[in-house]
Amino acid sequence: MASNPLAPVTEKIADGVWRHAGDIRQGMNVYLVAEEDGSGVFAFDAGTSAMAKSIRSAADELGGLTRVVLGHAHVDHRGSAPKLGVPVHCHPDEVEEAEGDGGVSYQPLKDIPVTYSRWLYKVVFPIWDGGPVSITGTIAEGERIAGFEVVHLPGHAPGQIGLWRESDRLCLCSDTIYLTDSTRPLGHHPGIYPPHPVFDQDPQQTLESVRKLAALEPAMIAPGHMEPLRGEPADLRRRLEAAADQRTGW
């Protein structure tokens, strides 16, 4: 990783897939995925508003940015989308949020159990956001994008999706899981965490989506935040199921 905690980094994580990590501690992930026709790369998720320039630069090194596919439309995932000048797609259940003002009605930040985090998120959410996104088209469960299958993983957001590639058992899963405790963002508390209920549209559905991810038996999970998680498929399945069953960390 770069020594500057704000400097974006780009790394290849799999065939035709690059992780572009930016913003604070390189904690916001945008995945650049090669288009099958060789026309460039598309972005899965769009990070924060401040990442627009670095996303464009990284994509240009890989043939150019063709489109954005939102894993979901929270402000730290849609942030740069209005600035990138390419078509933006999302799940039908996420269009309203993507085109809205960035105020998520189902996230009562006052209920975050760690006091400093309540204030921190209130400050950074408006900074991360780039404003409403004009959605060009929608994508749904079972559709295919550049060799990946769209998987609906609702709960954290109603229209959250992942991209699954069976050939190497790779899942780009947006915020289906966190690999640190999001209620304590100033520290690093490694583990597999379903998003805290305060961040979810439907906490029970979130756990069902974690189990759905587990059932895929991935060998690599590429989340919306932190570095990818790699392992034996059976072991990752066990760990994901345990996280859903125990809601690890809460």
Q: Where do the protein language model's features map onto the residues?
A:
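Conserved beta-strand hairpin/beta-sheet module of binuclear metal-dependent hydrolase folds
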Residues: 6-60, 163-179
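Short, flexible loop segments at the rims of nucleotide/cofactor-binding pockets, characterized by
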Residues: 17-23, 44-48, 65-68, 148-152, ...
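Glycine-rich phosphate-binding loop signature in dinucleotide/nucleotide-binding domains
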Residues: 37, 60-64, 143-146, 166, ...
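Residue-level marker for buried hydrophobic side chains located in beta-strands
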Residues: 42-44, 69, 88, 170-172, ...
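Metallo-beta-lactamase
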Residues: 48-49, 141, 149-154, 158-232, ...
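Active-site HxH/HxHxD metal-binding segment of metal-dependent hydrolases
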Residues: 50-137
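C-terminal/domain-terminus segments
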Residues: 103-108, 220-250
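Alpha-helix-centered segments that form part of catalytic cores
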Residues: 119-146, 200, 204-212
